[in-house]
Amino acid sequence: VAGGSDITLQGKVYAQSDVVLGAGSVNVKDGEIRTHRNNADTYADKKAADAYRKQLVNVSPSATVAKALGDGHIALAAVGVSSAEKPFETKGAIVIDKAYIDAAGGDISIASSAERNGGNLMGSKADASVEISNATIQGQNVAISAETKVSGKVGSADAYKTGAEEDGILGLLHATFDEQVGSLASVVKTGADSRVTVKDSTLTAAKDLAISSKAESEIGSETGGALGVGINVGIADVSSKVEIQGTSVLTAEKDLAISAEGSNAIDLQRQGSAEDLPIA
């Protein structure tokens, strides 16, 4: 697991237990991931596990090897982080291209997520994506998801301090009036973008297959401010979609669910008052 960095897999991974890959960006290209799990817990299975452990220890005496086979799950996770080049954007991405992923007796989870707290005039964005093309993915339960959440407060000091780095007027206002400026010219912009794309791929689940995209944006007000006048403006862009393209085939022995959900909430109030503004 490498938080905030990139992982690229182009080789083969054969595991007797679980496989977990986690980073800010996960790429599986021309790669293969297979797992096996101990279903019956029989003497033969235990003996095979013991032999496997001994082989690993012989290769690497310092290796730490599990005493029992795992469930054979496969999990790919991308957790978005911001970068120095784009400090106001949080992005998580998973790309699976020309790959074979098989959890013989376990579940498969492919999840990309991004969360961003604190909006500003220049825009604060969370972006999560899963792109699958020319791939074969099969397991017991298969879940593929992209989820983003972004929030901000209009009139907060943070909005001014962040905006001050990019806008001379806001910087001058904040430097002169500090907290007293309240929401004199307070503008917050946020964006949440989630998407899952499956193209020319085969997805098979012995039980349930679920593909989902969810994007959520919330903008609230920071009440208070000595001046108590001005205008609050909240701008929120939300996009959530699932696309099944080309020759893709989706099969589930039980339930197959595809969903895309987006929510956008803006709650703006007058400075120093609990009364809602008539516009948002």
Where do the PLM segments sit?
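Low-complexity, glycine- and small/polar-enriched segments
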Residues: 1-280
